[in-house]
Amino acid sequence: MTQIAPITFATRFRGFLPVVIDVETGGFNSQTDALLEIAAVFLEMRSDGTLARGETTRYHVKPFPGANMEAASLAVNGIDPHHPLRPAILEEDALQRIFRQVRDAIRAADCTRAVLVGHNAFFDLNFLNAAVARAQVKRNPFHPFSSFDTATLGGVAFGQTVLMRATLAAGLEWDTASAHSAAYDAERTADLFCTVCNQFQGVFEASRRRLASMGPLEVEPSPTGEASPTREVSPSGEPSSSSDPSASGAPEP
């Protein structure tokens, strides 16, 4: 009988490390509207393979030159971009600081790249990618288009797609007064993601046993035409090789 490797981030998510990102912005257009706050929440894996929320990092961000800021958006998130006591830093500095932590976490978890976890993740990923392009950051540790969306997961698991409702449906706490802060929303998103993953733990373990019985599986080429850095998945679920997470080629989703 094939021995199945212990559950790690690398085996649980096929070599990718989920990192929760939430942004607060001056609108809905990632190309024209300001990025005002960004928070990252790192996850921890317990000895039994279940997930828990870990460290939170949050930065206030200075609007880029010429950035649009809609009054309606500022009313929702309660941010005064020009408040003299707001400890805001440049987009590039905020990204570099978070990315440094993400790269360290990727190496520690023996993963190949990070995948953004977000509630309506396309929104956060679009703003992240737009800020990366503006700041000309060369080493983005996040996959450019793959993500884990907790709006989708909440709908599947609990029948709720709104963050507050999905959080409450999952049996977690919600503080309306703290909502629309990047750090608070990212932490609730992390809790929701961990809860759903943990509830699907039995399904995941059954799938690992099923795949292990099939023998080694070849990984299909990525949409970019490049070979995936994991190349082949062993019967244990362990990637047979890994690559530098800062490499420019994106692995398949």
Predicted regions and their residues:
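Acidic, Mg2+-coordinating catalytic module of metal-dependent nucleases/exonucleases
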Residues: 115-122, 126-132, 161-220, 252
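Long, low-complexity, intrinsically disordered segments
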Residues: 223-253
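Conserved non-catalytic scaffold segment of RNase H-like nuclease domains
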Residues: 2-122
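Histidine/lysine/aspartate-rich catalytic loop segments that bind and position anionic ligands
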Residues: 132-137, 141-156
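Amphipathic alpha-helical interface surfaces
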Residues: 69, 94-98, 124-131, 146-149, ...
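Acidic active-site catalytic centers that drive phospho-/nucleotidyl reactions
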Residues: 22-24, 124, 149, 185
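Active-site-proximal helix-loop-helix substrate-binding element of RNase H-like nuclease domains
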Residues: 61-77, 81-84, 150-190
